[in-house]
Amino acid sequence: MTIDIYEKINELYDKRREVELGGGDDRIDKQHEKGKLTARERIELLVDEGTFVELNPFIEHRCNDFGLQGKKGPGDGVVTGYGKVNGKPIYLFSQDFTVFGGALGEMHAKKIANVMDMAAKNGAPIVGLNDSGGARIQEGVLSLDGYGHIFYRNSIYSGVIPQISVIMGPCAGGAVYSPAITDFVFMVEKTSQMFITGPKVIETVTGEKISSEGLGGAKVHNAISGNAHFSSSSEEEVLAQVRNLLSYLPQNNEEKPERISCEQGDDYRPDLADAIPFDAIRPYDVRIVIDQVVDEGSFMEVHKDFAKNIVVGLARLKGEVVGLVCNQPKVMAGGLDIDSSDKASRFIRFCDSFNIPLITFEDVTGFFPGVKQEHGGIIRHGAKILYAYSEATVPKLTVILRKAYGGAYVALNSKSIGADLVFAWPNAEIAVMGPQGAANIIFAREINESDNPEETRAQKIEEYREKFANPYVAASQGMVDDVIDPRETRIKLIQSLEMLRNKKETRPYKKHGNIPL
């Protein structure tokens, strides 16, 4: 009997259907019972309809040890390929938990490494949908070697193309290092966990009892460890978040983010005059200022639940993408501590890597005091902010909303470390320390010898405030470029970004700097 081309074509489609079925209907049903989508269902939700093209669908493992001989897993437990999100190309991999539990082996890793290389060669973001039981133990050191190839690419492509990790199931052991190197980590509440050592091993070694969710769930990594940047209650929601994030990002480090048309003008915002309390010690939510300044509905907060004393995120100003770094006076008076320093520094460096202008809204009392902070290394961590701002060459703007005291004033994009423009509201207090503390030191003798120390202290506090703790002293010495009407803040920032659009700034040649990690 003669075999013609059409029989071979039919055979091809049969094999494709087998690959697309993954681990089979029973395992797909189990995946759905856990409230989880399959690897391919996730891809369909992430990319624009009809744009996904699969790479290396027929790859299989080549291990013949420990019972794997004859057990072939379609695609070796990972789907790789490319597609479009919001009309722009991306590359991706999606681990298939229905095939070998998504465990990573030699060929599985090669598929991921290959698609990462393709993303870098073509200058497009890489998105990893992680759902894996870890290393494939049967393949031994080949699995570990596979992780190494992925970690290497995460590292060398860092700052070259945006890298996004979405944790959609377990991510344990060595597997966690790949997401940690990427730019943003998304997690799903109750179904995704990350940890190096699992609960059972921890209990055996230390006696501590804890659940997987309590050890490494979405809430833990978003609010406590800071290892994750976003969380959602469902996989559908988290993938929509990823699509939204990608809309703010350039394709690679040689491009700028897309500037979209904006009907909102660079107009007065009258509510800004009363947006924050005039009393410098009264708290408020800095998001009120953000919402008044940026394009309506454009602010996407990053690391929302971690280190809440600083707010960072992406937004648009008249259609142009900007990165915002803002003190949060309603938490710890906006003071900087170890975690907020790390949070801000990482975000600043990301924005600089991908040509996103930085805007700082400053209202800071200083670095947070305490033995725990000092012993925890606040000196080193605080220095990261100085380093991040100093090395950044994107347009850098600062608006001092109220307080700017001490070393924190210097660290938060002051003129001395490279700010292009610094604006201050007329109520701003710029000084080594707050008027209360300064008056107690400078005028200590007069206060103590006074017949009415409290009255004298109040007078001296006001005297210090009038003489030093105002924006005009700094403006007279060039440390503030202009004192502005709060209602003009949006106008001034838009004008400044337009002026700085073609900014170019070089740095001395070096292999790389030595950031105080």
Question: Predicted segments — roles?
Answer:
Residues 1-517:
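Ligand-binding clefts of soluble mixed alpha/beta catalytic domains
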